[in-house]
Amino acid sequence: MIDDIKNVSVVIPVYNEEESLPVLIERTLAACRQIGKPWEIILVDDGSSDRSAELLTEAASDPEKHIIAVLLNRNYGQHSAIMAGFQQAVGDVVITLDADLQNPPEEIPRLVEYAAQGYDVVGTVRANRQDSLFRKLASKTINMMIRRSTGKSMADYGCMLRAYRRHIVSAMLHCHERSTFIPILANTFARKTIEIDVMHAEREFGTSKYSFLKLINLMYDLLTCLTTTPLRILSLIGSVVALSGFLLALLLIGLRLFLGAEWAAEGVFTLFAVLFMFIGAQFVGMGLLGEYIGRIYTDVRARPRYFVQKTVSAATPLTTSLRDEEE
């Protein structure tokens, strides 16, 4: 066993989770105390409109809890909030966890144990998943499309309960693209990975922040920001459509010659239908190209992916000790 882990950071993005926060903090603290190593909990408020930021500030003011509250000025999205937490984290292993308590914080010590065996990334698979049938089907579809498009073989990309070694986190922080999906990005740099089954519970507090439209947008973002496979597929489809159009044109010319101009006039609507199909395919292609160009434009502007409005912490022994060692 390779155990070079001196300390652990836990990063939790929070968005409108005031109902679950007291229980989340209590259970996460209890889990971290079982690690047997110095630890810190970084709670990132992603522009919540409820009392989440207030509760995080209150928790971070207690020096006994080892909590750092990072407050973003507005909502930037789950993965940007996690990157903000990574920027604050100093642990040799960094654990990410959702705030909805569907994945129990009690799994944290087990993830640290696997990371201590030398794995760069410890992924998780939700066993006996308690989501609705729609969410399960949507998740399976997204996972399948990601695996086929990116070539990154993972069973459950949607589960954010994961462990990352320090060098993986550092590598991700050097990536400045605006659209980021952390599990895939981490696997890009990881040499040794593993996936383990973890428990999954029903959501007790609040509602899911991922609606149907957000899931569709997420799938589209993943396919366009992480791979050029859609462009290659589009080129293949364009070639097939062009060849089909050429063959159809030859067929129409032949039928006109053998059956006369009268038949050709009666086939105008068929021709229009085929034309509209080709025009529709062109618009789909233009939209996809526009999405890629828009992402290039966004990345070229190099605007920050988030803005930290305030950081609150009453106890920072982990950060202080690490900085002293580096100096």
Curated annotation (Swiss-Prot):
It is a multi-pass membrane protein. Keywords: Antibiotic resistance, Cell inner membrane, Cell membrane, Glycosyltransferase, Lipid A biosynthesis, Lipid biosynthesis, Lipid metabolism, Lipopolysaccharide biosynthesis, Membrane, Transferase, Transmembrane, Transmembrane helix. The keyword rRNA-binding does not apply. Its EC number is 2.4.2.53. GO terms for biological process: 4-amino-4-deoxy-alpha-L-arabinopyranosyl undecaprenyl phosphate biosynthetic process; lipid A biosynthetic process; lipopolysaccharide biosynthetic process; response to antibiotic. GO terms for molecular function: phosphotransferase activity, for other substituted phosphate groups; undecaprenyl-phosphate 4-deoxy-4-formamido-L-arabinose transferase activity. GO terms for cellular component: plasma membrane. Pathway: Glycolipid biosynthesis; 4-amino-4-deoxy-alpha-L-arabinose undecaprenyl phosphate biosynthesis; 4-amino-4-deoxy-alpha-L-arabinose undecaprenyl phosphate from UDP-4-deoxy-4-formamido-beta-L-arabinose and undecaprenyl phosphate: step 1/2; Bacterial outer membrane biogenesis; lipopolysaccharide biosynthesis. It is found in: Cell inner membrane. The chain crosses the membrane at residues 233-253, 268-288. It is an enzyme of class 2 (transferase). It catalyses: UDP-4-deoxy-4-formamido-beta-L-arabinose + di-trans,octa-cis-undecaprenyl phosphate = 4-deoxy-4-formamido-alpha-L-arabinopyranosyl di-trans,octa-cis-undecaprenyl phosphate + UDP. InterPro entries: ArnC_tfrase (IPR022857), Glyco_trans_2-like (IPR001173), Glycosyltransferase_2 (IPR050256), Nucleotide-diphossugar_trans (IPR029044). Catalyzes the transfer of 4-deoxy-4-formamido-L-arabinose from UDP to undecaprenyl phosphate. The modified arabinose is attached to lipid A and is required for resistance to polymyxin and cationic antimicrobial peptides. Belongs to the glycosyltransferase 2 family. This is Undecaprenyl-phosphate 4-deoxy-4-formamido-L-arabinose transferase. It comes from Pectobacterium carotovorum subsp. carotovorum (strain PC1). The gene is arnC.
